[in-house]
């Protein structure tokens, strides 16, 4: 071991092995470090054991949360005078220093930092902070979990703070969550407490019954047919030669051409389920029925759309002609008056000329007539 190096608690193992390190100041370290709670490091400093702290490892570590206490061993909390509790956080003189009881209540110390208040009549609570108000007098009037509030007894009346889904003065009314009709597609709404559920009809699903179930998901169509989904139903677009709901039927092969003696008409073939291979012989296993079909050919003439167009055009033309005739008669209407001026004042008739014919005015009411022109010899003025 190199001279001048002192090994403590096997910390200086490097010295024993003869490693080229700077010798530690063993004498100085041992004189300052509390070797019962730590050890000397190679650099001469103290390394404390768990639960101890300080420059020389001379101070124990208190229990976490300890407020007014100390320790003799690690993780202890020994309370100072006047404090109590596990963490030394309760004042033993709370009744004299803080006076926690309110509204005239008397504080009684129970030891260990605890106390209780002796409340005067009409008050209650840990610190006599609550008054026997409307809530207490009514005996918890709020229903369905509602909270009664009366400003700690000082309010004249109580109010109920209702839980979600209830309403009313005392929370007695269950809110109808189906009032807005949230369920779609004819579903039945079932009201609950602050919730609802939809009883969906067949073919729909989802919280609001808005999802149409895919009836083609099970691939019901046969023969490679394409499936088209519907509401609680499906359609199969069968390939040529097949029919039925799921294309399970094989359509018959057309029979031989009709003979000359056969009556004209279509041939109706009964569909046969495709339970086996189709016979190769023509018409084998098929029943053909000839049906006479009488076709009455429509006489040549106007179709319904053309006939409607002609009627409408004729009605409009007649209306225009009638309006023109009425306006013409009104404009050229003549009146016969007794001798003298016309029997009707302007602007309807102008003064009579010679044979007392009245002049018709087409001007609006209130407009002056044009000045009278002298009639030509042998002519009568009329408009």
UniProtKB/Swiss-Prot annotation:
Glycosylation site list: 157
Bias (Pro residues) ranges: 367-377
Main location per the UniProt record: membrane
Disulfide bond positions: 29-40, 33-46, 48-57, 66-71, 79-88, 95-107, 101-117, 119-128, 135-148, 142-160, 162-171, 178-189, 183-198, 200-209, 216-227, 221-236, 238-247
Bilayer disposition of the protein: Single-pass type I membrane protein
Location(s) in or outside the cell: Membrane
Pfam families on file: EGF, EGF_DL_JAG, hEGF
Disordered, as annotated region: 364-383
Protein keywords: Calcium, Disulfide bond, EGF-like domain, Glycoprotein, Membrane, Repeat, Signal, Transmembrane, Transmembrane helix
Segments traversing the membrane: 307-327
Residues exposed to the Extracellular side: 27-306
Coiled coil: none
Keyword Disulfide bond: yes
Gene3D superfamilies membership: Laminin
Span of domain EGF-like: 27-58, 62-89, 91-129, 131-172, 174-210, 212-248
Signal peptide: 1-26
Cytoplasmic side: 328-383
A GO cellular component entry from the record: membrane
Recorded GO MF terms: calcium ion binding
Keyword Metal-binding in annotation: no
Record function comment: Regulates adipogenesis.
Protein name in the entry: Protein delta homolog 2
């Amino acid at each position: 071991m190199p001279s001048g190096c002192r090994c403590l608690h096997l910390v200086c193992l490097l010295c024993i092995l003869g490693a080229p390190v700077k010798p530690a100041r063993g004498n100085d370290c041992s004189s300052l470090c509390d070797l019962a709670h730590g050890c000397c490091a190679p650099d001469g400093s103290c390394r404390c054991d768990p639960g101890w702290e300080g420059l020389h490892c001379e101070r124990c570590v208190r229990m976490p949360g300890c407020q007014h206490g100390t320790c003799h061993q690690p993780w202890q909390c020994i309370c100072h005078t006047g404090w109590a509790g596990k963490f030394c956080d309760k004042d033993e003189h709370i009744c004299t220093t803080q006076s926690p009881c309110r509204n005239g209540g008397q504080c009684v110390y129970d030891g260990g930092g605890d106390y209780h208040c002796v409340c005067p009549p009409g008050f209650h609570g840990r610190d006599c902070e609550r008054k026997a108000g409307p809530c207490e007098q009514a005996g918890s009037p709020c229903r369905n979990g509602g909270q009664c509030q009366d400003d700690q007894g000082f309010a004249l009346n109580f109010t109920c703070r209702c839980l979600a889904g209830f309403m009313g003065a005392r929370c007695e009314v269950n809110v109808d969550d189906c009032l807005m009709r949230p369920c779609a597609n004819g579903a039945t709404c079932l009201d609950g407490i602050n919730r609802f559920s939809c009883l969906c009809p067949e073919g729909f699903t989802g919280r609001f019954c808005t999802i149409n179930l895919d009836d083609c998901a099970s691939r019901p169509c046969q023969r490679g047919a394409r499936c088209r989904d519907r509401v609680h139903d499906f359609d199969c677009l069968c390939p040529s030669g097949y029919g039925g709901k799921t294309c399970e039927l094989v359509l018959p092969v057309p029979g031989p051409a009709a003979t000359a003696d056969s009556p004209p008409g279509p041939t109706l073939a009964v569909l046969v389920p495709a339970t086996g291979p189709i016979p190769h012989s023509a018409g084998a296993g098929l029943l053909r029925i000839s049906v006479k079909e009488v076709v009455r050919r429509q006489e040549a003439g106007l179709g319904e759309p053309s006939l409607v167009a002609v009627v409408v055009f004729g009605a409009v033309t007649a209306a225009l002609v009638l309006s023109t005739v009425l306006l013409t008669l009104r404009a050229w209407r003549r009146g016969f008056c007794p001798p003298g001026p016309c029997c009707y004042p302007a602007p309807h008739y102008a003064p009579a000329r010679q044979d007392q014919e009245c002049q018709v005015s087409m001007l609006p009411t209130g407009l002056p007539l044009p000045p009278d022109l002298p009639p030509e010899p042998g002519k009568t003025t009329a408009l």
